[in-house]
Amino acid sequence: MMAAEAGGEEGGPVTAGAAGGGAAAASGAYPAVCRVKIPAALPVAAAAPFPGLAEAGVAATLGGGAALGSGFLGAGSVAGTPGGVGLSAGGAAAGVAGVAAAAAGAGGEMAFAKGTTSLPTETFGAGGGFPPLPPPPPQLPTLGAGLGTVDEGDSLDGPEYEEEEVAIPLTAPPTNQWYHGKLDRTIAEERLRQAGKSGSYLIRESDRRPGSFVLSFLSQTNVVNHFRIIAMCGDYYIGGRRFSSLSDLIGYYSHVSCLLKGEKLLYPVAPPEPVEDRRRVRAILPYTKVPDTDEISFLKGDMFIVHNELEDGWMWVTNLRTDEQGLIVEDLVEEVGREEDPHEGKIWFHGKISKQEAYNLLMTVGQACSFLVRPSDNTPGDYSLYFRTSENIQRFKICPTPNNQFMMGGRYYNSIGDIIDHYRKEQIVEGYYLKEPVPMQDQEQVLNDAVDGKEIYNTIRRKTKDAFYKNIVKKGYLLKKGKGKRWKNLYFILEGSDAQLIYFESEKRATKPKGLIDLSVCSVYVVHDSLFGRPNCFQIVVQHFSEEHYIFYFAGETPEQAEDWMKGLQAFCNLRKSSPGTSNKRLRQVSSLILHIEEAHKLPVKHFTNPYCNIYLNSVQVAKTHAREGQNPVWSEEFVFDDLPPDINRFEITLSNKTKKSKDPDILFMRCQLSRLQKGHATDEWFLLSSHIPLKGIEPGSLRVRARYSMEKIMPEEEYSEFKELILQKELHVVYALSHVCGQDRTLLASILLKIFLHEKLESLLLCTLNDREISMEDEATTLFRATTLASTLMEQSMKATATQFVHHALKDSILRIMESKQSCELSPSKLEKNEDVNTNLAHLLNILSELVEKIFMASEILPPTLRYIYGCLQKSVQHKWPTNTTMRTRVVSGFVFLRLICPAILNPRMFNIISDSPSPIAARTLTLVAKSVQNLANLVEFGAKEPYMEGVNPFIKSNKHRMIMFLDELGNVPELPDTTEHSRTDLCRDLAALHEICVAHSDELRTLSNERGAQQHVLKKLLAITELLQQKQNQYTKTNDVR
């Protein structure tokens, strides 16, 4: 309260805590009423005038007492003033040693003997009283600590963070204590070293990148570290974390998270003098925004702070009158000079009116509790706050201080805005609070009225907002993982000049980002399909700060899209860049790792019932296995990690126990340095496990892992010409030999061969020849293609690579309907809920099957013609081998199309990118029943005694058998190999280098084989000779050039 009176008996008690009891008392910090005996000899400066409390002709008494924030009374210290109570009034002061008093409420009063002036006391608010001590750091969990854990249902929220700005209440010193404006690195380092304390910091505008900022920090090792801060459309990004202000960024790294390991921001370093370098502009014409854009409407005379100068004359600004942010165009504004008051544009500031005009405004436009601020007439540089009560108008002086604060009534604030905010909550005069400011009137605006508005508006209409980001290397939509299991489709721009990945809600609103990632401090890692149960995922890991890993997850619609984005991002990631002079343009080097998690032995019974493994590269999780039962689980799962970032030096595997919790803790772990593995050779080893938790004498067990680490040195394509020619020979002697010696590397071999033959448009030769060989070697029609061979693996990979559009067209609508439905299709008596109607469930299942099968039958033309030609070749081959088996031509195609493509997509639609989220238990069960029914239809088999509850589907199978036969026959009805214009997107040099690496790894087996095989002997010996020659050339490249 700014005006109050109280009387007290000389030497009597002081009472603190009148109106309202006070916030501090309510919190239990100290009693609402505190009594302290004041000596009678206390000198009082009440008779002295208080300049700054009331200006001529206006009565106002201001209070400057203090509330004790620590919750106790200490002799000799009040509100942080050692030695007694300090009261300041225009140079007059009174202090008493060893006396303490506390006021407990907004209405509290302190009474002094022999005085008529009352000094009301108030609890500290934001900026009130003497500068308060900073609050203790919030007790928050450390972000991004160590190895993350996940549950089987893709809850990876631990190491991940969202694009939303940090929403934790943050406190920071005032801007003028740490912001230095435009400053070069050398001077920044000098100022920090002069401060002499580790933990000292400042923020400066970058001298190298105008418009961006740098946080300079003196570490415990006496090294000055510089952290880039990107300013974009009013937000501030460091690494990838977004803040709405630089003050919030300072508060976060002061109280919540470390900037370097174990080091937070501690001591702000102030500039030699205050810095006000923000560009300000004023509207010379009014403007109304275009709907559904990021533009803002404004009035003539509105003042703006410019945050970003975008392309084609657009600017991102804050309107000081409305606090609204958005786009304006420079044609509608004029520059505001440095000489103009920095408060110009605030809705409450009136810099061009006289004292009398201020009175008139408040009396005519304002109401009781209205206010405005204008420059002081008596003291240049000071300000006066004019406040209207129901009876009169009062004025209060606001004085800037040498330490860049503002004083009003003996209290210090970081800004005039803080003063206004304070007295919106606290009484400024007894019974009154600040409410609505009186805005500037039209007659106050000093503008050039001779502006040709018509021409300017016409110019604006011709401007485009499509080119805000000029150096766009890549753009398009990607899925980004949000909290929990949500994936959202967002619009991304890869900006090349500043190495930034910027993303937006949509392409239409691609102005203010939803988020921004500074790629210069990032690395890109692959994400295996197993981690989220969906393909085409990758992650960007921020690795520049103390938080070990800061992760963003993304997914492409297709493997090609994900690969394109990863390659584009890697080119701008700091960790992927070669040092000058270390790279050889003629020789590339790519590392890959294949892990087979085989089994575990003697896991602790107490801790494991359903164990699964989490796989990390360094400390970044990239994959996980399924959960298995027991203490000796067998997984036999393969994980391929291609094109590893160059900083990867180890893999880690942790073991967790699957529970119903959202996250399962890591219990056991093993680590293996890649340098231990012989390059190009498979290692099969039992690793002893270590424990994250005390096992109390129990042995942790062991884990069997097969690992193959390869480092491909890729030479120019012409070096592989003879090698390629030998592989592509139509007899496929090299392919047959490699399939014989590469049993454990079958999947890798198939992937490499398919890419090479696709590039040469010879995939049909490869697949048809291998399929024919498989058919010729099989005696029993019923077991054809049941085993996993190179031929079946190649067919499966080929379908997944080329038939995605067919799968989506045939299945997506029905699967989405299943996902949305709450109706069960359960038919099994053991799984039916109580009172559940099986007939209703069956009708729902048959309805789904009818819709789904109809879509599949109608989608035959969408299958790639080359794949259909291969199906036709299969049909001809089996007809020739088993001429009397009339169903074989149908079943050989269904075995691939349904068993290896359509039914797996129905069972796990996330793996085929049909859905983003995991299906509910009802939906998952429905998908299983649908897949079983479709597979039986494709096999032309009805349900029988094994699953009698499914017999209700048999009429559907019978009625659709003939259509299924016609559909499968039609798929193979492409008698001639079609011409294709599609160009393969493979990296031929790398694929040839990878195949050469396999030949080197299996050279001993190939040499043995070359001595046994008659017809292949010549070809295999030539292969061995070429393999050796390529190895010698590779060594020559390595010796003559340093390869990173």
UniProtKB/Swiss-Prot annotation:
For the site labelled Arginine finger, the residues are: R786
Record note on modification: Phosphorylated by SRC and LCK. The phosphorylation SRC inhibits its ability to stimulate the Ras-GTPase activity, whereas phosphorylation by LCK does not display any effect on stimulation activity.
**Keyword set for this entry?**
Acetylation, Cytoplasm, GTPase activation, Phosphoprotein, Repeat, SH2 domain, SH3 domain
Gene3D superfamilies listed in its UniProt record: C2 domain, GTPase Activation - p120gap, domain 1, Pleckstrin-homology domain (PH domain)/Phosphotyrosine-binding domain (PTB), SH2 domain, SH3 Domains
Please list the residues that carry the modification Phosphotyrosine. Y612
Q: Where is the SH2 domain?
A: 178-269, 348-438
Phosphoserine: which positions carry it?
A: S828
Name the GO cellular-component terms: cytoplasm
Instruction: Spell out the CDD domains in the cross-references.
Output: C2_Ras_p21A1, PH_RASA1, RasGAP_p120GAP, SH2_Cterm_RasGAP, SH2_Nterm_RasGAP, SH3_RasGAP
In its keyword annotation, does this UniProt entry include Ion transport? Answer: no
**What are the boundaries of the region Hydrophobic?**
1-160
Domain named PH: which ranges?
471-574
The SH3 domain, residue ranges: 276-338
Job of this protein: Inhibitory regulator of the Ras-cyclic AMP pathway. Stimulates the GTPase of normal but not oncogenic Ras p21.
**What name does UniProt use for this protein?**
Ras GTPase-activating protein 1
UniProt lists the gene as RASA1
